Amino acid sequence: MIIGGKKFDVEHETYVMGILNVTPDSFSDGGKYNGMEQAMEHARQMVEDGADIIDVGGESTRPGHIMITDEEEIARVTPIIEKLKKEFDVPISIDTYKSKVAEAAVQAGADLVNDIWGLKYDEKIADVIAKHNVACCLMHNRDNTEYSNFLDDFMEDMRECIRLAKAAGIADDKIILDPGVGFGKTYEMNLEIIDKLEIMQKLNYPILLGTSRKSVIGLTLDLPVDQREEGTLVTTVYGVQKGSAFVRVHDVKKNKRAIQMTKALMRDHEV
């Protein structure tokens, strides 16, 4: 898989997508990096720590978040994307579900569109992705948590995302799938989809797992958002074992090391 001119061996490796929220209200790090210098300094640290992709978000998607206008989101993300592209040789992802924001971000240099609605919120976003031939990550999401059979319905929802992508002309080798931990699911469903992550391999697309500091970890360990790193690392290790090609995380260094150790244990050993 090629993203931003870089080759990703999604069959054998697990890559780290570092989170860069330039928002005042994201659940974990809102307000910490919404100034240009703070954002760039954090990006430098993530690249130094081994981030394979930087994911830029201009609107919080936490529960109860306040929606902002396309123009406001564009004003937040495009300057940082332009600066990141000038300074780093690392692919840049834009975390948005809005076609106008995606268009502006790709024109600013974004190499991947990370859509938390899997092309279902804004029908024009698929056309933007196809037109520019950039990669996309399609996340599972729903307005409610009512399922007839959770795993069956989940898989059908993912197939619908794929159908939308293909109908717009997005190439197979540009698609990544995300199970959407923390979105449109109960606590037990979130645990279940992490545990059964390997079922997504039947869809034959690379998997991105995003669990970093999420409520499923907080509820399990009864910990606030700033104390969920160990829980995140466990889900990263589990995800690697289940076939994740990417993990989206806040702490790049720790997750990179956890992946490296897990891969060493999983490979064939010459004894």
Residue ranges with predicted function:
Residues 1-24, 166-170, 263-271:
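N-terminal amphipathic alpha-helix/helix-capping segment at the start of soluble metabolic enzymes
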Residues 3, 28-37, 41-42, 61-83, ...:
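Active-site-adjacent loop and "lid" segments of alpha/beta metabolic enzymes
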Residues 20, 50, 113:
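Conserved hydrophobic/aromatic pocket- or pore-lining residues that grip, position, or stack substrates
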Residues 41-57:
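Catalytic domains of carbohydrate-active enzymes, especially glycoside hydrolases
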Residues 47-48, 161-174:
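Phosphate/pyrophosphate-binding loops at sites that engage ATP/ADP/AMP, CoA/4′-phosphopantetheine
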Residues 180:
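Conserved Motif II region of HX4D acyltransferases
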